[in-house]
């Protein structure tokens, strides 16, 4: 049975079973590979996407659960001609080392900045509590989010 969901503002159809994790539909059916499989238990944040502007862990979210919601992935931010402010700030602050966590970090940061455009450092850290970086670049990630928000680092 076909399932149609809105991804990055466009309707997309998959033949996946309703219980299939959203992450696998995004990656395998729609070839949107920014969200990553990290733990499979919603503990690391590598799979974070936005569903109706709220961060969700796509590795444990059944595709059927997103229904008529809009799913936004990193690929839906900015364009090849003009990066989203968060993407540019992560580059400018050299926030990535291996880069595996970065899509999830950016999506969590986007949700934060959409809700709170000028967050404090404590609010940024709290918003990222579900996103892990094994390389230890959390300080650069926080600086990048501050830069994107126009908050002095």
Which residue stretches match the model-derived regions?
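Signature of N-terminal electron-transfer/Fe-S-associated modules in redox systems
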Residues: 1-153
